[in-house]
Structure formats: structure tokens, C-alpha cells
Amino acid sequence: MAKFVFVTGGVVSSIGKGIVAASLGRLLKSRGYSVSILKLDPYLNVDPGTMSPFQHGEVFVTEDGAETDLDLGHYERFTDTAMSRLNSVTTGSIYQAVINKERRGDYNGGTVQVIPHITGEIRERIHRVAANSGADVVITEIGGTVGDIESLPFLEAIREFRGDVGRNDLAYIHVTLLPFIGTSGELKTKPTQHSVKELRAIGIQPDVLVCRSDRPINEDLKRKIGGFCGVPNRAVIPALDADSIYAVPISLEEEGLCLEMLDVLNLTDHDSDMKNWVQLVHKLRNPGPAVKVALVGKYVQLNDAYLSVVEALRHACLTQDASLELSWVCAEQIETHGPENLLKGMDAVVVPGGFGNRGVDGKIAAIRWAREQRVPFLGLCLGMQCAVIEWARNQAGLTGASSAELEPDTSHPVIHLLPEQQDVVDLGGTMRLGVYPCRIAPDTLAQKLYGEEVVYERHRHRYEFNNSYRNLFIESGYTISGSSPDGRLVELIELKGHPFFTACQYHPEFLSRPGKPHPLFRGLIEAAQLRLPASPDEALRRQSQTNISAQEKPSRIG
């Protein structure tokens, strides 16, 4: 039978509940326990798929095509375990399910109420994750802050859950903040005390307090917090601000979080294998030469809008012994100031996904600059579509070429709506979503990077390359290096003769992991490193490779 851990947060929002949940998952997995993590979000949207990135950050897509909270990306990256649509629950989806049941008559004419129907549906979703995943431990993060009206049904549901499984099979973690007041020179515990008081009023006594702070927490303070909040001193876990989110599991392990959880849940403490993770953090803190990467996007004012892209770049830099020097470039600024002024000196350019025509001309200009200046380029989803438009206009002779999404009346719709999307009216959950296979063409950069004939990648799009222009693109120099197995959909393109120029219709960033970077991102960083001034050892290695290549070339004499 599964064990259950519930993670709540208090005092302020964005306290780091998701990282705590993901870190605990990492620590449990390092001891041989299987883990699944789900997020309960208190907003009324059915899912975040139609929400603005400025409101919510990126939308993370699961293998089965769910559009979910970005925290699921943290869960997958930390535990290296694929989540599903069951791992993302919103108030909107709960109410939708309950109302549908009421309309079908499932409640036999009874009055439908928050208790027991809404809370019962929430509990059922948690049980469903346990049954579907078969995990030893199911960790549930409750979104929002204790005291919010929106979170009350979720908190009541996890209180009731204790009756479902018994007290020895679940644990409550409360993440809170200890603010430092400069005038008094002290970390203050009163906000934490009041947050726990709110939680107790609901009927939940936390087993562990994870206390965020920007400076060390001494034993006297831990005793004070434990005494006022009713937890053992050892269960007051300091969580100091870290230089990287990947350092948090190590910090929490040193403070005893996992041992305390194992004790509460009556689980055996197996030997922990965190060696690779410790090495990863060491490399993060001791990086190699910086690689300058420009991320050209529409939503660059909010870094979380491209969270998985940034993490994928970090993973690639880690493996390549490089440090990431990221420049956030607003696509609209390129339209105003030109690409040369904003991209000069960059070692690589990434154009990620997005929607709408704002900033598209800037993205196209950035892609043209990368192509002509021979700067390594990677396009993702809309980034591939912009690369197609750029080539059509400037190399294939298709004046005015565009996407049917951006310019419905364009004379050359090189990007058009997928046939199966023609009659779709609703926006939410109706795109081409989730994992689809892609067949890699032989003798291509893609084949070199992947080393596979067929790969499986996550998608989120309605528009696709228009095959009416396929032959023209090939004849003008484009290489279609990846397609759907039936050859109908173009998934991956590249340019031969360029140091690194490739773009894909899918989202490879969702599959990148610490220590296991996605091949496309690793290839980009590897190509970018070739632009860096070579160290003496590296220069010697490159010269050696050049000499070997020259010896292998057939003679042209005679």
C-alpha cells in the first residue's frame, strides 16, 4: 500500500513547495523507493493551457498530452519519472467532474455540496494517482497559501484523507518563511506560528516544518519554533536560500528531512545513493568557460515562461563543462533595433515556442541573422515555423510567405492548420498534445545527435509545415531530417553546411534531465563551444582532428 505525503505552504506565496516536494521525491528515490508527485492547484481554470504565460509561467506538457503546471517539470527533472494528466488537478477540473456527475444523476438526487462531494472528488484523484502509478510514496503539493479561501476545499480533503489511510501512512509537511528584520537583527518566527495556527484550526497538525530563510537557523530558534508549533525539534528543517535549485535536495538531506519522513511513515531507511547528484551540483558550482546564448522570445519579462528551455540549456552546459551566460532578448526589440545590435557576440541563438504574431518579425530577423552569421541556432515549435518562414522569404523566393495563423490571407501559407484541427472550436486541451514518434532521416545532423531511427517527443501545436511546399524547400537547400512515421508531418529541419542550424516542431526541453541533457540542446552547446577561444590543450586537440581528417580525404591530384 502506498504512503502519502502532503506539502502545504504558509506566510507567502512562491515559498518553494514544489522544489521541496521534488527534492523529497529525489531523496526517496535515491533510497530505492518509487515516487509519484501531484499538484493540486486552487484556480478555477480546468488546466493552465489557455492561461497567459505572464499569469502562470510555462505550460508543461506530459507524455499523455496534459497541459499542466510548471511544477510538474520540476517533479520530472528531479525524480526522472514521467508524470501524467492524473498528476495535475485544479479546482476547475474538480468542479467540472462533480457537475458532470450531478447532471448524469450519479448523486441520486442528493444536494451536491463542497463537503462531501468536492472534497471526496479531490481525495479520489489522489487515490487514483497511487493506483495508476503503483508508487511506494505519493507526494501531493497543495497550491496557494494556508489562509487563502481558494485552498480550503483542498486542505479539508487532505485532512479527511487521514481517515482513508490511517495516521501511520501519511505525513504533513508545512513550508514556511522566517523573515529577517534588519533593525532587530533577528529571524522572526511569529508568521510561522500564525501559519501553523491556521493549519491546526482546519484540523491538520504538521509533522515537519521546512523553514525558508536567508541565513542559518540556530538550535535555540528551532526549539522555539518546535515548542510553539507542536513538532519535535528535529522536525524543524532549515532551508536556506540556495545558489541552485539542484542543491536543495542535498541541503534537505543534510538537515534530516528524508529521515524524518521515513520515521513518520514507518519506512525503512535504505542506503542513499546521491553520488551523481552531488557531482552534478559540484559541476554547477565549478563551471567551465561561459557560453553566451540568446533566448529570443515574446515573454522574456517573466523567466518562468521558458523555464524548461532554460533548464535544458543548463543541463547541456553541465554535461559539456560549460557555464550558461543567458541573454533574454525581446523579439519586439529586435524589430526596433535590429538583430546585429542585440545578438552580436552571442555563441548561440534559441527561439522557443509561443503563440500569436506579436514579435514574430523579430524572431524571423534573429533566425536570418543566425543563419547568415553562421551562429548555432535551435528553433522550438513556433521557432521552427519562423525558421521555415524565414527561408521561404529569403531563400526559396516566396515573397510574403507566412503562417496561416499569423496571416490568414497570405499568398504562401508555408505553415498551415493541421487537417484534424479544421473544425475545432474550443481552445482548451484541443491541440496536438503529448508524445508522438518521429522518424529520423539517415545521414543528417539529427541522426548524429540522436543516434536513433525513431524518437518520441512531446508536442503542443495546431499548425504544421505545409507539404505543398516540401519539394521546393528541399530543392532550395533545406533538409527535412525528421518526419512522422507516415511521412505526412514535418517534425525536424536542418541546414547542411551550417555549423548548427536545426529546428523542431516539438518541445525537446520537456525531456531534458540533469545529467541527461536532450541531444538537440547538447548539440547546440557543443557547437557554440567551438566558437570560444580554445585553450592550449583544446587547440592541440582540434589541430590533431584536422590533421587526421586531412589524411583521410582522397587526393584530388591527377
Swiss-Prot record:
Coiled coil: none annotated. The active site is at C381, H507, E509. Its EC number is 6.3.4.2. CTP binds at S13, D148, I149, E150, K188, T189, K190, P191, T192, Q193, K224. It is an enzyme of class 6 (ligase). Keywords: ATP-binding, Glutamine amidotransferase, Ligase, Magnesium, Metal-binding, Nucleotide-binding, Pyrimidine biosynthesis. L-glutamine binds at G354, L382, G383, M384, Q385, E405, R462. Mg(2+) binds at D71, E141. Pathway: Pyrimidine metabolism; CTP biosynthesis via de novo pathway; CTP from UDP: step 2/2. Residues 542-552 have a biased composition (Polar residues). HAMAP family: PyrG (MF_01227). Catalyzes the ATP-dependent amination of UTP to CTP with either L-glutamine or ammonia as the source of nitrogen. Regulates intracellular CTP levels through interactions with the four ribonucleotide triphosphates. Belongs to the CTP synthase family. This is CTP synthase. It comes from Prochlorococcus marinus (strain MIT 9303).
